[in-house]
Amino acid sequence: MIIIVRLAGEIGIKSPRSRKNFEHALINNIKNVIDVEEVSIDQGYIILNTKGDFSKLSKVFGIASFSPADVISFSKLQDIVDFVKNKYAEKVKGKKFAIRVRRVGKHNFTSLDAAKVIGSSLYPYSSGVDLENPEIEIHVDIRQDYAYVYDKVYEGARGLPIGTTGRTIVLFSGGFDSPIATWMMMKRGSSVTLLNFKLGGEVHKKIVLDEVKILSEWNSGHKIKVYFVNGIKVLSALAGVKRYIRVVVLKRIMYKTAELLAKKINAYSVTTGESLSQVSSQTMKNLFVTEYDINIPIFRPLIGFDKEEIIELSRKVGTYEYSSKLPEYCAISSKSTTSANLEEVLESEKQVNIEYEKLIDEAEVVEV
């Protein structure tokens, strides 16, 4: 079976060298998820020859859309007309149809000429032509002396191929936000390593791993590594911190742990699921205090999203079922300030005895 894969739009406008790198990465990712017998690149298309199930392509980032297609050789336009008529005369019976022609190369006919002639050959068998809302849409993509013919276009995940933009450490609580922040960074081509402060025992861990299994379906066959840090030990160390700044200090500990892990595994950023002013610790002032003197980029892909939008995305991605079962363990104080004082937070942090190297060294590491 021949599958046409169309590249996500922004890949096509990159420099020739960058585009080649992205195409190579995408092809490798495709080979990770479906059985490909042969692959080639044809003027903006990746052409796959496969006998396997191709539906998994819908979750491969870097793909705009894909179609199973027939490939035909021709010497004259009538060859294409005859093929399309033989294949689709029965399929258009009683239906409104449309012909979509795209053409690359030099021919003695235009795309419009081809569409008219092909459409005329099918018209007697159909209920007529409807270019706005056809019941069946037949595509003919013409190259020099061959053409791709198909009637199904499946949506891809778009974005950039996994592994093309570097690695990020995701602070992954397992609630609604962090899985979607992870997914959005994956969509931008990032490899992800997850850091979880295990606050809810084995129940918490199981839900997190269930979510990671869902995210793995979008990860182009690559494994996702999760570091489970002893969160209870961290909370115990915060016992002497004033309640109204305790969450901010906890977040700083999380950031610093993630920063250290990033240095250890050559990641270039830290990603969080924070959304501006969604909760008290996520006001602009508190975010400033939280990331003060953190020397690595902090990405917040959900910063402008509201909770309803995040939950809707979780349904699309597939993590909703598991996220809805997990309490927000980071809500450790109901009286948190919305405007933490930087000097007070830094002074309180000095009193907290955290061995960051030890936290990471003693973390349980699970690969999904």
Swiss-Prot record:
Q: What is the lineage of its organism?
A: Archaea, Thermoproteota, Thermoprotei, Sulfolobales, Sulfolobaceae
Single GO term (MF): tRNA-uracil-4 sulfurtransferase activity
Q: Which Pfam families match?
A: ThiI, ThiI_fer, THUMP
Which GO cellular component term is one of those annotated? cytosol
Catalytic reactions of this protein: [ThiI sulfur-carrier protein]-S-sulfanyl-L-cysteine + a uridine in tRNA + 2 reduced [2Fe-2S]-[ferredoxin] + ATP + H(+) = [ThiI sulfur-carrier protein]-L-cysteine + a 4-thiouridine in tRNA + 2 oxidized [2Fe-2S]-[ferredoxin] + AMP + diphosphate; [ThiS sulfur-carrier protein]-C-terminal Gly-Gly-AMP + S-sulfanyl-L-cysteinyl-[cysteine desulfurase] + AH2 = [ThiS sulfur-carrier protein]-C-terminal-Gly-aminoethanethioate + L-cysteinyl-[cysteine desulfurase] + A + AMP + 2 H(+)
GO BP terms, alphabetized: thiamine biosynthetic process; thiamine diphosphate biosynthetic process; thiazole biosynthetic process; tRNA 4-thiouridine biosynthesis
Q: Which UniProt keywords apply?
A: ATP-binding, Cytoplasm, Nucleotide-binding, RNA-binding, Thiamine biosynthesis, Transferase, tRNA-binding
Q: What is its main location?
A: cytoplasm
Q: What PANTHER family does this protein map onto? A: TRNA SULFURTRANSFERASE
Record's function text: Catalyzes the ATP-dependent transfer of a sulfur to tRNA to produce 4-thiouridine in position 8 of tRNAs, which functions as a near-UV photosensor. Also catalyzes the transfer of sulfur to the sulfur carrier protein ThiS, forming ThiS-thiocarboxylate. This is a step in the synthesis of thiazole, in the thiamine biosynthesis pathway. The sulfur is donated as persulfide by IscS.
Q: Where does ATP bind?
A: L171, F172, N196, F197, K251, G273, Q282
Q: What SMART domains does the entry give?
A: THUMP
Family, per entry = Belongs to the ThiI family.
Could you say which EC number(s) this protein's record lists?
A: 2.8.1.4
Q: Which residues form the THUMP domain?
A: 51-153
User: Which positions are tagged coiled coil?
Assistant: none
Protein name from the UniProt record: Probable tRNA sulfurtransferase
Pathway listed for it is: Cofactor biosynthesis; thiamine diphosphate biosynthesis
Q: Does the keyword tRNA-binding apply?
A: yes
What are the boundaries of the signal sequence?
none
Q: Which cellular compartments is it found in?
A: Cytoplasm
